[in-house]
């Protein structure tokens, strides 16, 4: 899969294009290939140093672009690389099955867990099928149905958050979008099993919060979490969506800032260049975090688990 480079990555893209061109010559150049090995090695070293330099000083706007990268791993990618024996479950038993939310039972190192997450889709047909990762009320009701199932069978719940927001269409509002989100917030706060939430891309407003109440809330290094998109914020405050970079900086939507505010618990490191550059390494980092946090949470008696979660929520808003 060829990588899509973002605007701020152009110097890296140019270097990697040169490296690939030299590799191509090396593969088909006969004896002259020997002379190219050293040059390729030097360029690879230069590319690595450039990546480290660029990614050591990313602004909020660059991070927001990375969070939306079309090749970033989605929920089903984590299902593939982190879990075993995944069985997808469908439908809210009231209206329909929303494909923007994927959910099901799987095993994590042999342990049964319930997985729930947003799914955006990559190709045009799949994006439409998944509604670009923007769930409707039936998606959140499906999620709640399966959370309750997990509670009955004492299975930990793991959620993957990656949405621009809940779908704002007329039909979704008529079917009770706000009620579905509010009900999930209330019910998740009282679940008697461990709940670990992971923001893996965009954490957009109530659409993210609806599967984001848990004992641990983690964010990937280059993910975002906010009440509105930078473009939306800029359109409201400055009547100009081109001011999105300024809005992103002002909103404090990046993982490091949210960790300072104690709105999230842990930042999961991404491979150099972002999660999209190495799905397998990103999944390994995710798996290690989940195993460690689950081992800790499973030691707590039920009443302690609920009290811990309650105190965590009550601390929101205090500096």
Swiss-Prot record:
Q: Give a single Pfam family match.
A: ACCA
SUPFAM superfamilies registered for this protein in UniProt: ClpP/crotonase
**UniProt-listed Enzyme Commission number(s):** 2.1.3.15
Tell me the keywords, alphabetical order: ATP-binding, Cytoplasm, Fatty acid biosynthesis, Fatty acid metabolism, Lipid biosynthesis, Lipid metabolism, Nucleotide-binding, Transferase
Q: Name one GO cellular component term.
A: acetyl-CoA carboxylase complex
GO BP annotation list: fatty acid biosynthetic process; malonyl-CoA biosynthetic process
> Which positions make up the signal peptide?
none
Q: Which NCBIfam families match?
A: accA, AccA_sub, PRK05724.1
Q: Say what the protein does.
A: Component of the acetyl coenzyme A carboxylase (ACC) complex. First, biotin carboxylase catalyzes the carboxylation of biotin on its carrier protein (BCCP) and then the CO(2) group is transferred by the carboxyltransferase to acetyl-CoA to form malonyl-CoA.
Protein name from the UniProt record: Acetyl-coenzyme A carboxylase carboxyl transferase subunit alpha
Q: Which organism is it from?
A: Vibrio vulnificus (strain YJ016)
């Amino acid at each position: 899969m060829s990588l899509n480079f973002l605007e701020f990555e152009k110097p890296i893209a140019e270097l990697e294009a040169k490296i690939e061109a030299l590799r191509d010559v090396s593969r088909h150049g006969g004896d002259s290939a020997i002379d190219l090995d050293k040059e390729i090695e030097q360029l690879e070293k230069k590319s690595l140093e450039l990546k480290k330099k660029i990614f050591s000083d990313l602004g909020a706007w660059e991070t927001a672009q990375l969070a939306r990268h079309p090749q970033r791993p989605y929920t089903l990618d984590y299902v593939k690389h982190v879990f075993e024996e995944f069985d997808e479950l469908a439908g809210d038993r009231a209206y329909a099955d929303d494909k923007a939310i994927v959910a099901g039972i799987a095993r994590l190192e042999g342990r049964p867990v319930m997985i729930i997450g947003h799914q955006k889709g990559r190709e045009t047909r799949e994006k439409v099928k998944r509604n670009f990762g923007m769930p409707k009320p039936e998606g959140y009701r499906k999620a709640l149905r399966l959370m309750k199932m997990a509670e009955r069978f004492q299975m930990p719940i793991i959620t993957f958050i990656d949405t621009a927001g809940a779908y704002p269409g007329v039909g979704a509002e008529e079917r009770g979008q706000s009620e579905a989100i509010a009900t999930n917030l209330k019910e998740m706060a009282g679940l008697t099993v461990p709940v670990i939430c992971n923001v893996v891309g965009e954490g957009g407003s109530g659409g993210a919060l609806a599967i984001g109440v848990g004992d641990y809330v983690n964010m990937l290094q280059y993910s975002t979490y906010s009440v509105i998109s930078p473009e939306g914020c800029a359109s409201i405050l400055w009547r100009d969506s081109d001011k999105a970079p300024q809005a992103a900086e002002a909103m404090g939507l990046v993982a490091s800032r949210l960790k300072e505010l104690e709105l999230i618990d842990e930042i999961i490191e991404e491979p150099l260049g972002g999660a999209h550059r190495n799905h397998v390494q990103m999944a390994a980092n995710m798996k290690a975090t989940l195993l460690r946090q689950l081992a800790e949470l499973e030691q707590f008696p039920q009443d302690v688990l609920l009290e811990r979660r309650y105190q965590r929520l009550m601390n929101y808003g205090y500096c």
